[in-house]
Amino acid sequence: MPGYRNIVVLALIIALPLAGCAAIQRGEAKDREQLLAAAGFQAKLADTPEKLADLRTMPPRQLVSQSRDGNFVYSYADPDYCQCLYVGGPKEYSAYQRLAKEEEIRLYRP
């Protein structure tokens, strides 16, 4: 059974970094979503199969702007972790940019 043990060890060597990458992505999404909420973005849960299907058609974990009736609307879709859509306007987007810059400075301050 030495060959079987080698296969198991190899599978673990491959799987562990992938699990780590998923955890990092989940953590980054959580951090961004906390900033969006702090900036005043409204979280809308995809609490029906139809809403979740709509959410999955949007670019995942990207802040996207759209013009509606002459006003900008910003949205951030997370179909994987929170299964929700964050929505805000120019005021919330400006607050988000300020908070994100403050967080960047805090993290990279020597």
Where are the regions a protein language model picked out?
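Bacterial N-terminal signal peptides that target proteins for export
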Residues: 1-9
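C-terminal motif of bacterial Sec signal peptides marking the signal peptidase cleavage site
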Residues: 17-20
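Bacterial signal peptide processing site
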Residues: 22-25
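Compact soluble domain cores
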Residues: 33-53
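Intrinsically disordered, glycine/charged-rich N-terminal periplasmic/extracytoplasmic linker segments
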Residues: 52-110
